[in-house]
Amino acid sequence: MPKRTDIKKVLLIGSGPIQIGQAAEFDFSGSQACRSLKEEGIEVVLVNSNPATIMTDPDMADQIYIEPLRANIIAKIIEKERPDGILSGMGGQTGLNLTAELAEMGALKGVEILGTPLEAIYKGEDREKFRDLMNEIGEPVPKSIVLNTLSQIDDAIAKIGLPAVVRPAYTLGGAGGGIGRTREELTRIVELGLSRSRIHQVLIEESVMGWKELEFEVMRDSTDTCIIVCSMENVDPMGIHTGESVVVAPILTLRDDEFQMMRSAAIHIIRALDVQGGCNIQFAFKDGDYRVIEVNPRVSRSSALASKATGYPIARVAAKIAIGLRLDEIKNSVTGCTAASFEPTIDYIVVKVPRWPFDKFKGADRTLTTSMKSTGEVMAIGRTLEESFMKAKRSIDTDVRTHTSPSEIRMILSRPTDERFHCLFDAFRQGFTLDEIAGLTSIVPFFLEKIKNIVDLEKRLAAGCTDEDIFLAKRYGFANTEIAALTGRGADTIEALVGAPAYKMVDTCAAEFPASTPYFYSTREGTSEIVRDKKQKILILGSGPIRIGQGIEFDYCTVHAVKALREEGVEVHIVNNNPETVSTDFDTSDRLFFEPMLLEDVTNILMTDEYYGVMVQFGGQNAVNLAVPLEKELKRRGMCTRILGTSPDAMDIAEDRDRFSVLLTTLQIPSPANSSAYSEAEAREKAERIGYPVLVRPSYVLGGRAMEIVHNTAELETYMKEAVRVSQHHPVLIDSYLRNAIELDVDAVCDGKEVLIGGIMEHIEQAGIHSGDSACVIPTQSLSPEVIATVREYTKKIALGLGVVGLVNIQMAVKDNVVYILEANPRASRTVPFVSKATGLPIAKIAAKVMIGKKLCDLGFHEAKIRHVAVKEVLLPFNKLAGVDTILGPEMKSTGEVMGIDYDFGLAFYKACISADNELPLKGNVFVSVNIGQKDEVIPIARRLRDLGLTLYGTEGTVDYLHEAGVEAHLVRKVQEGSPNVLDMMHHGEIRLIINTPQDRQSRQDHYQIMRAAVDFQIPYITTLQAARAAALAIDAIKREKITLEPLSHYLR
């Protein structure tokens, strides 16, 4: 049937901030859906709270609302915009939950739910309804019982037994779920699961741990035509969330009759659900038998992987199906000549490996279960499974420990952590047999054989190998440097022997039809499919897997750079290995390389064609770290390709503390007393000279990794043992810590002669909390015109002094009206998307044009003057990571960001808090606990909260000095003083907000239980007095006036 004529305007709900379980894949799918709908002449209204997304760009939708994703707010937008339909399946779990809530509150009268019908949401997400549907259609499910209260636990154990799996309804990434092996463990998981579930429901399910886990991505249209887009198989068995698993596509270990049985079951289920669009179905499989585990009646993380693995644009097709088009009416935009009803065929093997945040969270529980903990993932493509495994291993940018202790290896293999995939290789190196490893892990022997092949070849290479072994190593995906290290030969010698790789095309049809959107991977089989031409080309280095410190913001910058260069007629190629992102969409760039982001791989790509230049400054710290070695490698090979924009030497000046200090001295710009040290003794001497407390950090890292404020020599010595390991080739940087200073971030573009300031952001938290974790505001709220003028002057001096061409981010601190420079980063920063959305200045696009020679004076942009207030707030991952210190400090911990925008600071901050799942209460009890050094500062905040009608509670010391100041507060016992205490009040829902500001390590330990409980019971919490002051302003504002609901374009006009 042709597209529906009654659907003229569609509301699309985004997924909100990046978080564990819901990352960039929904920006990728949402952006694709927006473009797909607009191609059909549909007016698109988009709601999302995340400014760091491509989908919230002005050209992606007709009306864009950057607002909290709350049903009551979206209901008002629906009332205002009056859409004909709502597309919920592109916004992940958030989108489905909101659609269900909107329907239940009656806000969707006259608005049709497109693609995924409401009943399919209920049957897919409500565990009891899903189980009943599967039983009704004769599809086997694990034995299970639905719980709504803790009192049903014993009944569940009697019927299901232990261990048992807990699956909460309507949650994301398995949040609140897990595997209970004892009654106590099961009770704890169920209590958490019930609190996290939208409908207060969990399913207790018999364990099928150790079975194979299989996934099918299915597409269905309104005429009941179904296709399997991709089949996927988890290397890790059941018991580990698929988002935490190493995944292989296509399925390799089923016989054809078994595969056809599973294919038929997947199609049977999507038909029963009546989903029109995409659907992800997960199965457990063992010895010819299977169980249906769950269904995602929406685009998911697995959908993004399936889309990138096959080249099939799932979200684009699903959006068109939602407005009535049939699969055979939709053109496959990759081939340009086949219909979307053709099932994709692939002649290569794809491997996905997750990226975990444990390099940031040393104390976190690293055990992998049915609840997600990873922040991102990499994807690798090869012609053999060995090759894909090795390319994926090289793509994960984590320091991997080698395990040699047999007992330690057994423990990791049997109780899996994030180290298990790498530990499989260690086990074979230490002489474990295949049967032993299979017994410990329940991993299919087929996968273990491939890993054993790799390790056996490593041993041959190290023992004195033949040239044939080296050729085999290349077919297995070894890098030249890895072969050189094993054989003792030089990397150049290896390269001369093996030559260059071939580049093959991903085309959805195993080369049966020509592809019109080139998308390549390297391999050692056959001839290259790249056709060289004379066009001017630029390669942009992407940002790799999403991790804390390097998130979706850098992909945003990459995509903007591509758009800018294409506007100037330049052919743009991207190299990246992240399957979740817009930059790796099939039509973002002129040519896409899905490859590891390492020097050898990037150099190989540059040798495939005549490249004019490479851009490194949009891909975050990893790409910037490649600048100097890549420049050297290009010169060594005599290649004409240049590093475009700011020179690698200027980047080095900014990173090298001594060189940067010389520059600041020359420019007569103050900075905190600072130095650098290469040893513990030198660090001790320099810190004592500067004076404690000092801020210490390694150089050349992103996200404040291993950064800490240390107060004495003992803390410094403890720190140095970690920091020196993190930064083996660069010094540790030591800065005087400015207490109670206001921190600023400035994003600017420089063309070498002029500087355009994109935005000056004032941090709401004090200096010393990582800028990536601090809420910030545009325009500044507390700085004098004289200070702002100094900030502008210093920004211009530093940008020109460094010789910046492109973007620069400068961090400053203001104390006693003196502006100090903390650091400068001549590259894209994580605040670029926020600045662009808040001001309307597309600074990443401007920077890309400047990098190819355009002048700011010719581009016609000026610093924005805005009437509104925009607040960036962060989302913290503590609800997904047990054992993590919840106190903010100089090391970054947040996974994503949101934006609040209004005409008043208090209202904008209130919106930002709602969006960050930290909704401030307008009534109820507030628990306040601050250290004695902050008692004078907390009194006016406490007084304002009391005057606003909130009731204050605190422990003895805090209550005493509040009473002395005439502020009424109620005493509550400390945890160690027995019950009833603050934890009891939290458990019973009697506390609505926590203000808790520990300063030293001892008070951190004392307050850890309170903050952990706040996370578990979803009570908003504040850990700095600056944020508490802003919260009081926000509560005051929201009590006085209503929030504004306007499209972004109205604020920026």
From Swiss-Prot:
Keywords associated with the record: Amino-acid biosynthesis, Arginine biosynthesis, ATP-binding, Ligase, Magnesium, Manganese, Metal-binding, Nucleotide-binding, Pyrimidine biosynthesis, Repeat
List of residues binding Mn(2+) 3: 811, 823
Tagged with keyword Transmembrane: no
GO cellular component terms, A-Z: cytoplasm
InterPro entries according to UniProt: ATP-grasp (IPR011761), ATP_grasp_subdomain_1 (IPR013815), CarbamoylP_synth_lsu (IPR006275), CarbamoylP_synth_lsu_oligo (IPR005480), CarbamoylP_synth_lsu_oligo_sf (IPR036897), CbamoylP_synth_lsu-like_ATP-bd (IPR005479), CbamoylP_synth_lsu_CPSase_dom (IPR005483), MGS-like_dom (IPR011607)
Amino acids binding Mg(2+) 1: 282, 294
Stretches the record annotates as Carboxyphosphate synthetic domain: 1-397
Pathway assigned to this chain's UniProt record: Amino-acid biosynthesis; L-arginine biosynthesis; carbamoyl phosphate from bicarbonate: step 1/1; Pyrimidine metabolism; UMP biosynthesis via de novo pathway; (S)-dihydroorotate from bicarbonate: step 1/3
Broad enzyme group: ligase
EC number: 6.3.4.16, 6.3.5.5
Region (Oligomerization domain): 398-530
Catalytic activity, as annotated: hydrogencarbonate + L-glutamine + 2 ATP + H2O = carbamoyl phosphate + L-glutamate + 2 ADP + phosphate + 2 H(+)
An annotated GO BP: glutamine metabolic process
Domain ATP-grasp intervals: 131-323, 661-852
Binding site for Mn(2+) 1: 282, 294
Cofactor binding comment, as recorded: Binds 4 Mg(2+) or Mn(2+) ions per subunit.
Annotated region described as Carbamoyl phosphate synthetic domain, given as residue ranges: 531-919
Subunit structure comment from the entry: Composed of two chains; the small (or glutamine) chain promotes the hydrolysis of glutamine to ammonia, which is used by the large (or ammonia) chain to synthesize carbamoyl phosphate. Tetramer of heterodimers (alpha,beta)4.
UniProt free text on domains: The large subunit is composed of 2 ATP-grasp domains that are involved in binding the 2 ATP molecules needed for carbamoyl phosphate synthesis. The N-terminal ATP-grasp domain (referred to as the carboxyphosphate synthetic component) catalyzes the ATP-dependent phosphorylation of hydrogencarbonate to carboxyphosphate and the subsequent nucleophilic attack by ammonia to form a carbamate intermediate.
Family: Belongs to the CarB family.
Record's protein name: Carbamoyl phosphate synthase large chain
Source organism of this protein record: Methanoregula boonei (strain DSM 21154 / JCM 14090 / 6A8)
Gene of this entry: carB
